[in-house]
Amino acid sequence: MASTENPDPETGKSEPIPASATTPPPSAASFLDCRKIDVIIRVLLFSATLTALIVMVTSDQTEKTQLPGVSSPAPVSAEFNDSPAFIFFVVALVVTSFYALMSTLVSISLLLKPEFTARVSVYLASLDMVMLGILASATGTAGGVAYIALKGNKEVGWNKICNVYDKFCRYIATSLALSLFATLLLLVLSICSALSKRTP
């Protein structure tokens, strides 16, 4: 076994080699692990936003309801494009889903070409925060309208509709839950980016 001590030419005694001199340089394994985790989170983000988008645009439901001035019930459809808040929500899901796909491909490419990581990571971190703001605001806005659809508002004469359009409301609730999960993933990505910048 190789000795970790150097003999002193004056005293003839061995002196211990500093620990820093025997410690191997940090490997790239930890860096690759971080990039792999980043890719996994972005894949989850894409899956969540795409699923939320599909569920939202397929939430249409038609039921026969009694309309004022009409003697017999008439078929009335409930669609996401009936509400500007839901339209904004769908647009936000489209944008975020597309961004998640593109950023996943970029993150995978950084595994193959790590020399571009520092510069590209700055752009990804900034865009992550932008997407976080867009998706969070859209989710909150759509959630407010969904709550009125569920509970109604007697003070302003807004009736609840979820007792009639149950499938429509279930789909919206599922889409909102997936969007909230995607928002949390974007928050995790933003926090990880901030912590990685502070790490020496």
Curated annotation (Swiss-Prot):
Subcellular location: Cell membrane
Transmembrane segments: 37-57, 86-106, 130-150, 172-192
Keyword set includes Membrane: yes
Residue spans, topological domain Extracellular: 58-85, 151-171
InterPro entries tied to this protein: CASP/CASPL, CASP_dom, CASPL
Position of the signal peptide: none
Family, as annotated: Belongs to the Casparian strip membrane proteins (CASP) family.
Record carries keyword Transmembrane: yes
UniProt GO cellular component terms: plasma membrane
The name this protein goes by in its record: CASP-like protein 1D2
Mode of membrane association: Multi-pass membrane protein
Keywords for this protein: Cell membrane, Membrane, Transmembrane, Transmembrane helix
Chain ranges on the Cytoplasmic side, renumbered to this chain: 1-36, 107-129, 193-200
Subunit structure: Homodimer and heterodimers.
Cross-referenced PANTHER family: CASP-LIKE PROTEIN 1U1 (PTHR36488:SF8)
One Pfam family matching this protein: CASP_dom
NCBIfam families noted in UniProt: A_tha_TIGR01569 (TIGR01569)
Lineage: Eukaryota, Viridiplantae, Streptophyta, Embryophyta, Tracheophyta
Region (Disordered): 1-26
